[in-house]
């Protein structure tokens, strides 16, 4: 069994936690990477991400895929879920939401590599896809295609 002391600083895992009111209030937590000497990819998929249009307050929906190659740290998944959920009542344009997620994770984790693909569902007839990446993929690490097809409507 892993040394439980390395998880002592986690405040959200293992108990009831309220959804934060905004991304700024959300607490992202990290844990030590037990495989820090090995390069490998981690993927999180949020197919029902929501935020609000900052002008109309109408809901916006996206399928978000986060891929990263961790260094010394892993993001704690419940804190990531709560962070992503905190956008539900947050007003921001698609581009801002998408890039902010990537930058916040980079700031927290200092990963070797990170990519966010945000595939926004159409509103006003125009789908918007936003991509953020910290640099080229690492040699020798398998990074699968994100698997989200271009929106075609009834096409």
From Swiss-Prot:
The active site is at 53 (thioimide intermediate), 60 (proton donor). Pfam families: QueF (PF14489). Substrate binds at residues 75-77, 94-95. Disulfide bonds: none annotated. It is an enzyme of class 1 (oxidoreductase). Coiled coil: none annotated. Its EC number is 1.7.1.13. One of its GO terms (cellular component) is cytoplasm. The keyword Cytoplasm applies. Keywords: Cytoplasm, NADP, Oxidoreductase, Queuosine biosynthesis. It is found in: Cytoplasm. The keyword Nucleus does not apply. GO terms for biological process: queuosine biosynthetic process; tRNA modification. Pathway: tRNA modification; tRNA-queuosine biosynthesis. It catalyses: 7-aminomethyl-7-carbaguanine + 2 NADP(+) = 7-cyano-7-deazaguanine + 2 NADPH + 3 H(+). GO terms for molecular function: preQ1 synthase activity. It comes from the Bacteria. Gene3D superfamilies: 3.30.1130.10. HAMAP family: QueF_type1 (MF_00818). Belongs to the GTP cyclohydrolase I family. QueF type 1 subfamily. Catalyzes the NADPH-dependent reduction of 7-cyano-7-deazaguanine (preQ0) to 7-aminomethyl-7-deazaguanine (preQ1). This is NADPH-dependent 7-cyano-7-deazaguanine reductase.
């Amino acid at each position: 069994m892993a040394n439980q002391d390395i998880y002592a600083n986690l405040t959200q895992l293992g108990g009831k936690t309220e959804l934060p009111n905004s991304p700024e209030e959300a607490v992202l937590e990290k844990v030590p990477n037990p495989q820090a000497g090995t390069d490998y990819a981690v993927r999180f998929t949020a197919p029902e991400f929501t935020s609000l249009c900052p002008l109309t307050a109408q809901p916006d929906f996206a399928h978000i895929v986060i891929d990263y190659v961790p260094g010394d740290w892993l993001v704690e998944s419940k804190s990531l879920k709560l962070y992503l959920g905190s956008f539900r009542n947050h007003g921001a344009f698609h581009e801002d939401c998408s890039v902010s997620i990537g930058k916040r994770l980079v700031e927290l984790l200092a990963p070797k590599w990170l990519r966010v693909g945000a595939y926004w569902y159409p509103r006003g007839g125009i789908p918007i896809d936003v991509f953020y990446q910290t640099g080229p993929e690492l040699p020798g690490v398998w990074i699968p295609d994100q698997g989200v097809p271009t929106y075609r409507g009834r096409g």
